[in-house]
Amino acid sequence: MRNFVALSALALIGAAPPSPDAKLRAIIVPVSQAQLRHTIETLVSFGTRHTLSSQTDPKRGIGAALNWAESEFGRYSAACGNCLTVARTSETFSGDRLPTPTKITDVFAIQRGTERPNDVVIIQGHIDSRVTDPMNATSDAPGANDDGSGTAAVLEAARVLSKHKFPGTIVYATLMGEEQGLYGGKTLANYAKAQGWNVVAVLNNDIIGNSCGSDGVCDSTHARVLSEGPRSQGEADLAAQTHSLGGENDSPSRNISRFLDGLADRLKIGLDVRQIWRTDRFSRGGDHIPFLQLGFPAARISVAVENYNWQHQDLRTEKGIRYGDTIDHVDFAYLAKMTKLNVAALASIASAPPPPEPKVEGAVSTDTTVTWNQGDAAARSYKVWRRRTDANRWEMAQTVRRTECPEPKQVMDPAAYAPGKDGSVTVSVLALQACKLVLRHIRVDDWVFGVSSVSKDGFESPVASAVPGGAFHPYIAPEKK
């Protein structure tokens, strides 16, 4: 027996480390239906969470709900040695559904990255609720699914992931004011911009808990991910380039959708992603849109089939049909799967270096040249992806190790100087050189190309497409000569 134990120990020492997907499967195990139910039960207990309801009543209204969410974040932070920074950000708005200036407050927790604290991935859900009349701030509006389910996913993600450390930063956000005009999304997007965050992805969870539609159709095996095609921020400048070079289906948000689709397939949790190629549902909107308007990659995650009898409805029964967004309509097994997908995505994106910024050349040539920046030292390799122009998913990739990229080059930088007796002295700095891959006998016309970054542990970023506006940072128009 002693020899067997010793041999087993030696085998473990020499064993390969778990794959990234194996790590993600282990991370999502603690996601709890019971905890998700507890969160929604508590949210429902506040009666209404309408944006215009009381912000000071300790038991009823939006203020009580925000205070409770803040206390939950605080509790999770205490359990992980104060690993979360719990914060609020507020702005005052007025509009069609805000007849008087109203303070909009988002409550969120920041889990700062150990290596790249400015690279940020955000999960968010709106905590406010409503009934039929969007201005009715007094009637009970349980909002169990819209958007108690998304808020529950945010809090559960914080509970589960705060037990781990990640190179990048994760932000868990509960937003106020969505039903009155996406004001919570605007507030947090403005905060992210003011902080100078490099927002890699925003996962907006809105209505993720019901599995049966108002027509009786049920589907607990799919999640819809909605994403914009051409990026909205910078659209006026990018339109002519996109018309010539393509990219209608390759915004950063669309590549987040592809990333989630592939992740769901690999996790094997009984949930498949159905990519919806729209910014949001037909003639509707969500809190990811203000992020898109500022140039941050964002997508909406939602149920496969909506039930319109259960959202934005007064609590009532008519002709034998029950209306209202009550907790008995939530499918908690389905909500747990949706939450696991989010948790895995957050962990994966926070573990990977941010996507590079690729460019492609190959006009009037039988070969294609793909180049990209190698700005993040955490990237140990890159994958150069391609797919046919009419294909949805990335089809094939070639790996380029960072050691195959050019070494940093010493260059003279007039902007950097050391003061001397005779004035400023120009000094040299190390400048990173672009990586390059030449694809022989691959015609640029027939393919879309992209590049992802891979960490030393094998975690891969979403793919950034080599198209106009394909980079994962806000678009900056070139200076006109």
Regions found by a protein language model. Name each.
Residues 407, 413, 439-460:
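Beta-strand-rich modules
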Residues 454-481:
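Extracellular fibronectin type III
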Residues 175-289, 294, 298:
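Metal-dependent peptidase/peptidase-like ectodomains
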Residues 27, 35-112:
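A non-catalytic alpha/beta surface segment that caps or lines the substrate-entry region
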Residues 109, 123, 127-129, 133-182, ...:
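Alpha-helical metal-binding/catalytic segments enriched in His/Glu/Asp
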Residues 44, 208-229, 275-353:
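Active-site-adjacent mobile loop/cap segments within catalytic or ligand-binding domains
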Residues 374-395, 415, 448:
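Solvent-exposed loop/turn segments flanking beta-strands in beta-repeat/beta-sandwich domains
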Residues 366-379, 439:
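Conserved aromatic anchor
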